[in-house]
């Protein structure tokens, strides 16, 4: 798996307050558009955090089922890229500032999927923060990122990761 390090502020490991592990997936629909979401003003690929009892793939398959209502199998997804993102002065939900290391395992689905809106089970946080699914081409996603004027300061971090992913995709 290709490994990319984003560390614009040159943080050292000993400066990190918290390390988080997440997993996300590049899912394509029948039109070759990428399925992503807007959550609290941030554009993200489908996925989320890895719970203590889960493997990375198990967490991803659970998140796919919850967020788009589709059941995939371990064999339907393959490794794409690992991003280690050092985040200086990251604003937390309780209004404190932390230096984070976000390690995100990105996968790509070998299967085209269709969102099953009637099977989606969002968390209370996702409902509260206006979780919304979007289907767009890589070019359209880059425009969404460029024109995103959210007040959520975390959006810049997600934008950096999504740009790294889009650069590596072989679709327009």
What are these model-derived regions, one by one?
Residues 1-24, 28-30:
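Acidic, metal-coordinating catalytic segment for phosphate/diphosphate chemistry
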Residues 29-32, 110-115, 138-139:
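Short loop segments at secondary-structure junctions
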Residues 43, 115-172:
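Nudix hydrolase/Nudix homology domain
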Residues 85-120, 134:
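Active-site-adjacent beta-strand/loop module that shapes the phosphate/pyrophosphate-binding cleft
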Residues 29-67, 71:
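Conserved Nudix-box catalytic region and its N-terminal flanking loop in Nudix hydrolases
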Residues 71-83:
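A short coil-to-beta-strand element that immediately follows conserved catalytic motifs
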Residues 25, 79, 105-109:
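A structural signal for short, well-ordered beta-strand segments
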């Amino acid at each position: 798996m290709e490994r990319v390090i984003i560390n614009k502020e040159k943080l050292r490991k000993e400066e990190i307050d918290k390390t988080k592990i997440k997993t996300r997936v590049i899912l394509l629909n029948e039109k070759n558009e990428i399925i992503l979401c807007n959550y609290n003003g941030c554009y993200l690929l489908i996925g989320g955090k890895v719970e203590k009892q889960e493997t990375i793939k198990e967490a991803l398959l659970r998140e796919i089922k919850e967020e788009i209502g589709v059941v995939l199998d371990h064999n339907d997804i393959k490794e794409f890229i690992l991003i280690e993102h050092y985040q200086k002065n990251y604003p937390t939900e309780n209004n404190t500032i932390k230096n984070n290391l976000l390690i995100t395992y990105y996968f790509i689905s070998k299967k085209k999927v269709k969102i099953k809106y009637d099977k989606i089970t969002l968390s209370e946080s996702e409902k509260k923060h206006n979780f919304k699914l979007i289907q767009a081409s890589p070019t359209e996603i880059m425009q969404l990122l460029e024109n995103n004027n959210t007040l959520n300061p975390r959006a810049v971090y997600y934008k950096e990761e999504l740009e790294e992913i889009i650069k590596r995709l072989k679709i327009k």
